[in-house]
Regions:
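Alpha/beta catalytic barrel-like cores
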Residues: 1-118, 128-131, 136-139, 154-157
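Conserved, mostly hydrophobic/aromatic
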Residues: 123
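Eukaryote-skewed repeat-based solenoidal scaffolds used as protein-protein interaction platforms
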Residues: 139, 145-182
């Protein structure tokens, strides 16, 4: 039996080399709104776009690191595209000034993974709850899952079991009232 090693989201070895270069960058809603209020929405979008591009470049470095380290699977960070699915901010990928370069870099991530035989998948954050009794939570979860699927598509991963998206249902006994047992 062959054992395939996998890496989840972040390479501590790369971060030890250069924490600033190899760390994912996020952005809070507060920071985005502060930028909008102080410098305008265009500047906030520009900063967000820059951070997303950085995250995608870091992902490319991590996939290449996996290849050099004999790691056969990489699970994408769910933080590649911060705030993009926040409905209150109404951000479209098309308005990101770096979207073309982001898409090209994501394609390169996929090309590198294929070249070195590295499988990839994703694991959306725990706040995504498909089994919620709250319709708004389910709607937001579907939006997040669609975004994650779009990223997998932009990378060029197959739409099958070889590029899994790990989704937790978050079942609790109270849900017995909601779901019919099949």
């Amino acid at each position: 039996m062959t054992t395939i090693l996998g890496l989840t989201c972040i390479s501590e070895q790369l971060k030890d080399k250069d924490k600033k270069e190899y760390s994912f960058r996020t952005m809070t809603r507060k920071r985005f709104n502060d930028l909008c209020n102080n410098e305008g929405r265009d500047e906030a979008i520009k900063e967000l776009s820059n951070r997303i591009l950085h995250n995608v470049v870091v992902t490319e470095s991590i996939v290449y690191h996996c290849a050099k380290s004999n790691i056969g699977h990489y699970r994408l960070s769910s933080a590649l595209f911060p705030l993009v699915t926040d409905e209150t901010l109404e951000i479209s990928l098309d308005e990101l000034p770096d979207i073309q370069q982001i898409q090209e870099e994501l394609k390169q991530v996929g090309d590198t993974a294929r070249e070195y035989g590295i499988s990839m998948g994703s694991h959306p954050d725990q706040f995504n709850v498909l089994a919620s009794t709250n319709p708004d939570a389910v709607r937001r979860t579907i939006g997040e899952l669609n975004m994650q699927a779009s990223v997998l598509d932009m990378i060029g991963l197959p739409q099958d079991h070889t590029a899994p998206m790990n989704i937790h249902i978050n079942y609790t006994p109270k849900m017995d009232e909601t779901f019919e047992i099949v």
